[in-house]
Amino acid sequence: MKTDLLACRHIGVNKADAEVMLRKIGVASLDELIDKTIPANIRLKAPLALPAPMTEYEFARHIAELAGKNKLFTTYIGMGWYNTITPAVIQRNVFENPVWYTSYTPYQTEVSQGRLEALMNFQTAVCDLTAMPLANCSLLDEATAAAEAVTMMYGLRSRNQQKAGANVVFIDENIFPQTLAVITTRAIPQGIEIRTGKFRDLEFTDDLFACVLQYPNANGNAEDYREFTEKAHTANCKVAVAADILSLALLTPPGEWGADIVFGTTQRLGTPMFYGGPSAGYFATRDEYKRNMPGRIIGWSKDKYGKLCYRMALQTREQHIKREKATSNICTAQALLATMAGFYTVYHGQEGIRNIASRIHSITVFLEKSIGKLGFKQVNKQYFDTLRFILPDSVSAQQIRTIALSKEVNLRYFDNGDVGLSIDETTDVAAANILLSIFAIAAGKDFQKVDDIPEATIISEELKRQTPYLTHEVFSKYHTETEMMRYIKRLDRKDISLAQSMISLGSCTMKLNAAAEMLPLSCAEFMCMHPLVPEDQAAGYRELIHNLSEELKVITGFAGVSLQPNSGAAGEYAGLRTIRAYLESIGQGHRNKVLIPASAHGTNPASAIQAGFTTVTCACDEHGNVDMDDLRAKAEENKDDLAALMITYPSTHGIFETEIVEICQIIHACGAQVYMDGANMNAQVGLTNPGFIGADVCHLNLHKTFASPHGGGGPGVGPICVAEHLVPFLPGHGLFGNSQNEVSAAPFGSAGILPITYGYIRMMGAEGLTMATKTAILNANYLAACLKDTYGIVYRGANGFVGHEMILECRKVYEETGISENDIAKRLMDYGYHAPTLSFPVHGTLMIEPTESESLSELDNFVLTMLTIWNEIQEVKNGEADKEDNVLINAPHPEYEVVSDQWEHCYTREKAAYPIESVRENKFWVNVARVDNTLGDRKLLPTCYGCFD
């Protein structure tokens, strides 16, 4: 392999390292290991037919060429996406900082205090601006947040409503079309009927359970919904409002006029449009609905010594716990973008946010009056940033379009011939003059350029916001760049990311996010593209999307791809809806059961339920494989109604099951489809693939297998790949005149992430991708060989090897010493490591996945750490350490405890803080001691203002 290729930088072990590792494993070669790990009948017969790999320099030139094909016109289309200004201090120190973008979801509280605080800021800003008491720390986008709101309100129906079968949700006709489309996709399988119309004309019938409104609406008009909301509540209907969060700096927030749920996007709080995403959706609601709200919630708690700290609260609501009983399948969301939006509000504060909103509104007022003088009638009586014009008889929309395009301007064109525009943070006086000139030329009239636009408003007193927001001190302390930079740095020092050490989370694939892959995201031609611009303006994006789709087809062995799903869970849902649409097309729509192994991740059953199926659980045998007898029995028992099998491969237990082809054949013989969960695709690429194995559809996690970052809990991308017969049923989009199964707001989902995966594939090439897979399997088996004689490995494949991850046995340790897998996980923090996956998929164990990116020296240091912890466990077992006071049950040890004048433990400070030599050279200090989870759930405090009595 050429040394100037990315593979040499991405893969952590070299040939000499591999030989050492193979000897430890007990095989003669890497090929022998792979042959003994992956069943021969599913091995690909030829290398992947991918383009030759590019060097990093060649890719930089190639991606710049693609970016150059994108035409960055000034866009006023609006409809949920707006140009914005990302403060350089946030772009440089957060968006482009691997400490922030390579970290994992903050389940491990003690090594996540920085991003937990940043997400708490986000929640607080959302609560303040919406005037709601509770918010989560992001959803995927506005449209999916709307669908979650409808599902949540459906679950909140009163007993009488449930008994009466109330199943109608009213959607005001002036909602964004992409939002209505996604709600429709989610509502149909739940048995929810959608009724659209004018909110003023609605009759509250007994079958109605909820209403969804847009504020300001899709035309830009800010309606006064107070009377309507009162009527809805009188009729026992809940009200959800899609609100432009920046407009709430000036408009009366929905929380003040009775909304039950407020949702939307925070894209315009400093996040670029990225041709549709990623950006953080938001969701706020009443306190009494906290256990029904989808998504993750950050709350306050205390550590064991009483120090205030943050944690993820009410986790038992989530799909990985509740499985088929979950009311949402949301998992990965948009944590990195929520973090950026939170920092945006911190940096600007109340005054800055109000000034930005006021400037936008003032320019809009100026344009309404100035364009109105040219003979155009503006229809919105109350508005924030959006105008809709009826054209005079002498002017056509096509004339306007032609003139606008000649000035490199995009406007919004309505089906009835009206023309609209939405002003944003980047609009200045010069831009306003250009807009004015477009309408003047079309009308054949002169206009006077202006040098300044005074502050003005048309918002009535009834709709004008009177209450303060962002009043917590965090929103007033960091308005200089120096203070902001130091605040961000102060937070990132509290977190473990890949910049610190290996993150061995099983089933999460925390691999390198190479700088060469990440750089294109800071390119304006990729950052600043609106998703609804004419296709020729996005030629670079479209070419990249086409190329990437073709490459993913090759890698998966499938015929079609949709890049629309914004996460793995969204991919699962999209894949199941695709299966449903296909079955209905062949007269098999009655099939409503999905077979799922007991070992599956909780998103599988949660997604199946959301897609309108019922689940049937299939047992696993003592070796961790699908119990074939139980599978056959369940398939036969349900064959007339069986729609699909959902299966992860290699299994969630980290094993390549030898019967996988037969499993697919059994399901197909019943007339059902095989859905392969691609969470473990990192063990397949180049060696086998879902299509070759016999699956019909799979989703991929770009943030796992294909090198896009986790971002502390998103953004993720979950494209689905399907066999030929399913291609016609892939998610569509209104932009293409086909809204079937639409699952996200933007036509290509989080398109801004795609250059990362495209770069990964283009720079790795077929040989590099295949070697990455082999090395991931090598690294996992090396760790298994090093740890098998102490902890023990729970499951192995037919020939005694694991796949790309393995499950470490900890149950016997607990039986003998009382030391739990959680104690081991917390002790790892003292050594500078993030915990592996706890108690999944087997309770009382740790699941470890090292990925191909780690070096032998890092793997050996991790082994030394685990063996040293093993010795610490033996000290407890042998009575050398106190069972009630030892380094494990007291872990982690924060700096403030170690340097305290009081030290009353039975072991030394050195043993607590510097257990091995490598820690002395690279010590990570936790900021808090072990956190009290019960306290944080017993009293949920989800904003910066919260405190304990």
UniProtKB/Swiss-Prot annotation:
Its cofactor is pyridoxal 5'-phosphate. The keyword Oxidoreductase applies. Its EC number is 1.4.4.2. Keywords: Oxidoreductase, Pyridoxal phosphate. Pfam families: GcvP2_C, GDC-P. It catalyses: N(6)-[(R)-lipoyl]-L-lysyl-[glycine-cleavage complex H protein] + glycine + H(+) = N(6)-[(R)-S(8)-aminomethyldihydrolipoyl]-L-lysyl-[glycine-cleavage complex H protein] + CO2. GO terms for molecular function: glycine binding; glycine dehydrogenase (decarboxylating) activity; pyridoxal phosphate binding. GO terms for cellular component: cytosol; glycine cleavage complex. The modification N6-(pyridoxal phosphate)lysine is found at residue 704. SUPFAM superfamilies: PLP-dependent transferases. Transmembrane segments: none annotated. The keyword Lipid biosynthesis does not apply. It is an enzyme of class 1 (oxidoreductase). GO terms for biological process: glycine decarboxylation via glycine cleavage system. The glycine cleavage system is composed of four proteins: P, T, L and H. This is Glycine dehydrogenase (decarboxylating). It comes from Bacteroides fragilis (strain ATCC 25285 / DSM 2151 / CCUG 4856 / JCM 11019 / LMG 10263 / NCTC 9343 / Onslow / VPI 2553 / EN-2). The gene is gcvP.
